[in-house]
């Protein structure tokens, strides 16, 4: 085997070991995640929203760990396939590139090496037999050819004279190098088999654990009666608890104070602080990631589709199959007004300069050139209007898909926003509510709504209709005002009456 081929072979073998070691470490992390979850479940009292955050945090950590395991095993499998391919290529040229042939040619002056060559052939066969363990038929053929080749080489070597000193040096050098390398490889192979068995057992145990234990604490307390077993199915179970603490007859502050007092008596305050920190960290990271997806992902998808697919296709379709340059009468009116604005100054300049009789042909050429430029400009505006309409539809479709597919993330975001809002002081809460309501439904908000609606209509290629804009401005802010007042009266007044009092004081 050539040196570079052996180096490639060793590199793939090291890749096998590294990828399997990475998967093994990730499987060890699964055990720690399960222990942490069991510890929090048995020692800490949570609300329903906190339990859902813990479950989502545990599921996220498990998904990340499983991704590392499966990716490492895929890398392991690919490296193993390349090793098999290299072994097949090497087996074709085995006689030409045999290590035994290289050694015999190098030590052609040695004699009486029958025993040493037998040891060498056995060691080499053991190595190649392991590398070709999946192809037993090919391994037998390889062993027969190797034995036959070694036997012929021994018979040829016995015909020449060798001394005992060279014989002993060759035996010691060959046996030491090959024996040390093989023992190291075999130890690695045994270690890899042990790691594969551990990973398989861990994954099977994880599936069982997720099916029976990764739910809210009240599920583990259900009795294993036949009635409960028939009526409760873990596979069809869905978590429907809200992401925040619902208000009831007893205020949340009292229930939280009692829970914390009980935890202090049990001596578990340190674990509570650690768990609350992890839960808050997960909620913040998950909420920020989801907000980033809601903001940037629709824009990136629509922008990419517009640049790579929509814009070239729409330009080709519009310029080839459409004879008109405008989409509706509003754009036609704007095009005619633009043409009049171009023609009138030109005619006026020529009349004032008294060159109308002598240069009427030049005037027509200038008007024709300006008209062509206007046609190109409004043709491009029509194409851009179609693109804006399609990209807007893509953005709304992407947002809808994110809302539908990310219900759990949305519930965590809702819980995080409410917790952040409730952690503010009463003055800051009232200020935030007052600022938001004044921006949307305040005294100066109708003019802002008119600008927003008019710009949106022009962006989509529609006419600036004052009646539609006035109707929208007169109804939509009123609906927002009604919803905000109902929320303040129904929800905020029950949670914190001091916020409502501060809000009314600041509003007056």
From Swiss-Prot:
Q: Which GO terms describe its molecular function?
A: antiporter activity; proton transmembrane transporter activity
Q: Where in the cell is it found?
A: Plastid, Chloroplast inner membrane
Q: Which InterPro entries match?
A: CemA (IPR004282)
> Per UniProt, which keywords does this protein have?
Antiport, Chloroplast, Hydrogen ion transport, Ion transport, Membrane, Plastid, Plastid inner membrane, Potassium, Potassium transport, Transmembrane, Transmembrane helix, Transport
Which reaction is the catalytic activity of this chain? K(+)(in) + H(+)(out) = K(+)(out) + H(+)(in)
Span-the-membrane segments of this chain are 66-86, 282-302, 386-406, 433-453, 468-488
Primary location recorded for the protein, binned into one broad class: plastid
Q: How does it sit in the membrane?
A: Multi-pass membrane protein
- Give a GO biological-process term: potassium ion transport
Q: Does the keyword Transmembrane helix apply?
A: yes
Q: Name one Pfam family in it.
A: CemA
Provide the Gene Ontology terms for cellular component. chloroplast inner membrane
User: What protein family is recorded?
Assistant: Belongs to the CemA family.
- What HAMAP family does the record point to? CemA_PxcA
Known function: Contributes to K(+)/H(+) antiport activity by supporting proton efflux to control proton extrusion and homeostasis in chloroplasts in a light-dependent manner to modulate photosynthesis. Prevents excessive induction of non-photochemical quenching (NPQ) under continuous-light conditions. Indirectly promotes efficient inorganic carbon uptake into chloroplasts.
Protein name, entry field: Potassium/proton antiporter CemA
Natural source organism: Anthoceros angustus (Hornwort)
Show the taxonomic lineage. Eukaryota, Viridiplantae, Streptophyta, Embryophyta, Anthocerotophyta
The gene that this protein is the product of is cemA
